[in-house]
Amino acid sequence: MITQIGSTSSERRCAICSKLGNSYNYGVLSCNACKMFFRRATLGKSEKFCINNDNCDTSNLILTCRQCRYNKCLKMGMRIVTNQYDSLDDIIKVLAKWNLDRSNKLMNFQCFEDPTLDQVIQKHPVFTKKPSNLSFSKSEWGFMEQLTTVEFMSKFEFTRHLFSEDFRIVLKSSCFKIASFIKAVRSYSMKKEDIRYPDGELIVPMELVPFCTSEFLARVQCRLIGRIIELKLKEEEFLLLIAIFVCDPTANNLTARGREILSFHQNVYNDALLQLCLRNEGSCGPARFNDLLSVCHVVNKHVEDIGQLCFMFSFHPPTTKYKRLCAELLGA
């Protein structure tokens, strides 16, 4: 009996600090103090640096470093459960609002500035209402797509806890991919079979068409949207896939802590997408889930093709100037 009592007591210890834990909070057995700490750190603007230059001993029962204590919460499996993440429907609702804001700015606003990526991160550029009779060039559409995608990515929870350089790496690694995916899905919603800008123009500059084979043109303009058409991609699936792409822990040169934070948040959206597939497809849900994740590979191939297209500009310079943000993100 004594052994059983001792065993039960040890099983009711907080996974974070090893004090007595009364219940599961955010998915992990924890004490009230660690529960409240995790909630405050998630909802607030906690420190983004380790006070000991990442030399804290995380095996200590009590961590005075807030950042390392928060990282330990993530490592032990605490899940973010705020008003933003209460349920699958809430997750989708938040993503839909962010995407609607992004789309509204893309379609109805313009930016006269020529910022670098660092300038966009430090201080968001000023948008002004676009006259209804104003037509964008391909380079202007490209700039607005990248700019509004950076702003969209900045709204995600993980940006509060990443080092600034890690966030910059994420933007350089994923922004162009996400903007390309969004453009393909918008073209799909317009009943097109090739990727186009919002005004209906094809994405390949006319001055480069004579130097492209028909096979390459078909690949760069149709492969990604072809996969989307094949899947009959739904709006909710699209939103969750964007979130999964945003939280990419595989980008080169991320810190170990950055990878851990991104992996945690990506798993939240992976779980949400699987839950959606199971709800919509029943026993076929896991197969649908895998099919949707395969889009990531197609997006990567599309971006490689765009890279080849941009390389052609080395020999046939564009007739319009591309802004610095586009040059940085395309060069990533």
From Swiss-Prot:
Start and end residues of each NR C4-type zinc finger?
Answer: 14-34, 50-73
Q: Which InterPro entries match?
A: NHR-like_dom_sf, Nucl_hrmn_rcpt_lig-bd, Znf_hrmn_rcpt, Znf_NHR/GATA
Q: Which Pfam families match?
A: Hormone_recep, zf-C4
Question: Per its database record, what is this protein's job?
Answer: Orphan nuclear receptor.
Span of domain NR LBD = 101-332
Similarity remark: Belongs to the nuclear hormone receptor family.
Give the lineage: Eukaryota, Metazoa, Ecdysozoa, Nematoda, Chromadorea
Q: Which GO terms describe its molecular function?
A: DNA-binding transcription factor activity; sequence-specific DNA binding; zinc ion binding
Could you give one GO CC term from the UniProt record?
nucleus
**From the UniProt annotation, which stretches of this protein bind DNA?**
11-85
Principal location listed in the UniProt entry: nucleus
| Superkingdom as given in the UniProt entry | Eukaryota
Q: Where in the cell is it found?
A: Nucleus
Q: Which UniProt keywords apply?
A: DNA-binding, Metal-binding, Nucleus, Receptor, Transcription, Transcription regulation, Zinc, Zinc-finger
Report if keyword Zinc-finger is assigned. yes
Q: What is this protein called?
A: Nuclear hormone receptor family member nhr-9
